[in-house]
Amino acid sequence: MKLNKIIIGTRGSILALAQAEKVKEILIEKYEKMKKNNDFGGIKGFDKNSPLEIELKVIITKGDKDLRDFTKIKGTTQKDLFVKEIEKEMLENKIDLAVHSLKDMPQQTPEGLLNACFPMREDSRDALVSRNGEKLSELSENSVIGTGSIRREKELLNLRNNLKIKAIRGNIHTRLKKLDDGEYDAIVLAVAGLKRVGLANRITEYFDTDSFMPAPGQGILCIQCRENDEKIRKLLEIINDDKVTAMCEAEREFSKIFDGGCHTPIGCSSVIDGNTLKLKGMYNDNGRRIFKEIAGNRENPKETAQKLAKEIKKEEIKDEEG
């Protein structure tokens, strides 16, 4: 086995491959810089005179094969659909690491694996892509909007309660084709995904995070590896972003408290300003949208998320009693 050979596991969609290619690119770039400066820090186990050799391995997940509405897929959570087979290959030592969209990751990480690195975050917002270039406020009554997320459905109806929501599945290009073929008047997609596949020009309207909250972790890349693989863990440290990690921890903690998934109407977003973590959260259920924001120390992201969740739950209880 070559010392410098690394296999990255990824789904086969254009978006997943673009994300994996980006991670491959920055790993090679950082490694070459260390090689040039002969400064490898604590990284061990590589032939420091040779370049990294990185291969992408496409792994088909259950979510790629089963395109039914999420609510009709039994025996697994929605988030397990896109990672389980990849995690299995990692545990069997068939791949060294995997690149995931954080918002697709389950709360529970399998024993032996570690969410080790959060190298970057793209725009966390959602966007409207309409067939005729109309913004949300300009769409006709009873226009058909495509989304597979209860959060997006609730946020859409909070802004326009005279729209028809229709489920949609598939990758970005599949969804855009369904839109262009006339199945929908508009669809909602993550800005991050559109940008990463070079389709930001299709965006009709960017939604403001206060009025249309993104999913926790939206736009963040997560790199997973084996917990006992010190060689890969040390390598991933060179591309980890501490700010993104803090945002990840805050938003994942918020999601965990509300048992967040595509069937849970919650949203969360954060920004880092110096040593301050600014966190926004939304819970939208039973016809009532609760939105709160809070600021805390970036060194204590989970604590900040817990305080925000507590404020939202307090408001929810008040509504139920009133």
Residue spans for each PLM region:
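N-terminal winged-helix
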Residues: I14-E21, E25, Q78-L81, Q107, ...
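Short, well-ordered beta-strand segments
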Residues: I7-G9, K57, A98, A116, ...
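Short acidic active-site motifs
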Residues: E85-I86, K135, T174-R175
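Small-molecule-sensing regulatory modules
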Residues: K2-I60, K65-D66, I73-G75, N158-G322
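Short, structured active-site "lid" loops
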Residues: R68-D96
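A conserved helix-loop-strand patch within extracytoplasmic ligand-binding domains
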Residues: L102-K103, E111-N162
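Alpha-to-beta junction loops
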Residues: I86, L91-H100, G182-A192
